[in-house]
Amino acid sequence: MDHRMENTEEERPEKNDAKDSIMNKIQQLGETTLPQLPQDTNIHCLTIIGQIEGHVQLPPQNKTTKYEHVIPQIVAIEQNPKIEGLLIILNTVGGDVEAGLAIAEMLASLSKPTVSIVLGGGHSIGVPIAVSCDYSYIAETATMTIHPVRLTGLVIGVPQTFEYLDKMQERVVKFVTSHSNITEEKFKELMFSKGNLTRDIGTNVVGKDAVKYGLIDHAGGVGQAINKLNELIDEARKEEGRMIQ
């Protein structure tokens, strides 16, 4: 009798923990079970969502991607021999220019195959991140906003500040044009276009138009992006095999 009571008491906490875990999943994710990546997967998925946070902390209600979280992940991906390819999923409104460029530069310098896909939006400084990979995709309904670098809500009254922003803008233009098929002339034309955006300068590029301009390589979805990444991984393996021989 005593043994049965002891077993029952031991089982109760485990059942309560299981119930709490299920309730947490329902509250946070709306699901009781979640699909998991296999342990032996050779592809890592990195999501860049919301606003890219730089040196200034954004309000807690904002969904953000913190560059100090992303950069160590990119370093770990480069060093991990089990990871052979990286899939970048973008749905960002933009954010800190220098933080976004830092992420884009790191992605462009990876020795492993990389593929990006823009879902929803890849606006502002999200554009350099989208083009930083070896191959880029955009969903047909996704958009990319191209506009000049600016300080939100401030009037630029000091010439040095204007010059600094102008140089930063040139860095963005140079990076995008050197990592995609769009020309500098066309990119600047889209950037300084008037009448496309309400009360702003710039252009909102949708889906296949981004491909037409040479900004993105292909219009497609997650399945196509993963297939392309696997192709690039196979090519990298063959190249490595040739070097060893």
UniProtKB/Swiss-Prot annotation:
Keywords noted in UniProt = Cytoplasm, Hydrolase, Protease, Protein transport, Translocation, Transport
Q: Which subcellular locations apply to this protein?
A: Cytoplasm
Which species is this UniProt entry from?
Bacillus subtilis (strain 168)
User: Has UniProt tagged this entry with the keyword Protein transport?
Assistant: yes
Q: Under which name does UniProt file this protein?
A: Translocation-enhancing protein TepA
Cleaved signal peptide residues: none
Predominant cellular place of this UniProt entry's protein: cytoplasm
State the similarity comment.
Belongs to the peptidase S14 family. TepA subfamily.
| Single biological process term from Gene Ontology | proteolysis
**Which Gene3D superfamilies does the protein's record reference?**
2-enoyl-CoA Hydratase, Chain A, domain 1 (3.90.226.10)
Write out the GO cellular component annotations: cytoplasm
Any idea which residues are catalytic in this one?
124, 147
